[in-house]
Amino acid sequence: MNTAPESDLAAGPVQLPHSPLPAYYRDEVEHQRFLRRIFDETASDYDRIERVLAMGTGPRYRRMALQRAGLAPGDKVVDVGIGTGLLAREACAQIGAAGSLVGIDPSPGMLKQVALRGIQLRVGRAEQLPCADGEADFLSLGYAFRHVSDVGRAFAEFYRVLRPGGKLLVLEISRPESRIGNALLKAYMRILVPVIARIVARERATSELWRYYWDTIEACIAPAQIIAALEAAGFEAVRRHTELGIFSEYSAVKPESSGLLK
């Protein structure tokens, strides 16, 4: 299986998805160790908390986002940061039996929670995907952008793994533009959600995960920087669609006539 050489991936300056968060880790080694621990420990709680917080609307929104990005029946999909399979479940329903899906995640604990038949699961990171060049018609990253270590490396890998003409969808939560909206979302995510997590969750680390979740949202780079990074990686037709002012959908296309990298 072709993957990008480690030496190539190490070239160039590192672009972080958000400023460092010393309350959780001191350096990149600790960052990766923290992410592995927090997602492994909270995997069994994740779907339960998501259903409560989204009030049952999550599946419909994910389905519509995939449709807007151009996912088609029969597509070969690579879902990066598959987690427990929430986005992959909707993708499988849309691609049908003629399609295929590969789910990738660095957390074995999360992968154990994926209850989907007929898909492949691989342990891996966005910065070095265990995928062949041009393997995918469609590549998705659902609410995991804030957890990558290097935006440029990750987007270069997405470009490599997509076939020419392949489509990309990145789902993320963005800070509201208004001060009031931002304050309300912060209070919800930083205070109320951890309280709900302590009540509903079975694992002690779950409330910590949701506090970290908000802190990464608050520290995340601006949407314009994400769009610029996608364009720098070689993608075309880069667009951002938003729902309710906070749910961002970044869609893009790999040019039909292109090399592996720009």
Describe the role of every protein-language-model region.
Residues E30, R175-A229:
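C-terminal alpha-helical "lid/dimerization" subdomain adjacent to the S-adenosyl-L-methionine
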Residues G152-P164:
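A short glycine-rich, Lys/Arg-flanked "PGG" loop and its adjoining helix->strand segment in the class I
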Residues G166-I173:
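Conserved beta-strand signature within the Rossmann-like core of class I S-adenosyl-L-methionine
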Residues D137-V151:
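A short SAM/SAH-binding and catalytic strip from SAM-dependent methyltransferases
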Residues A233-K262:
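Core SAM-dependent methyltransferase catalytic element
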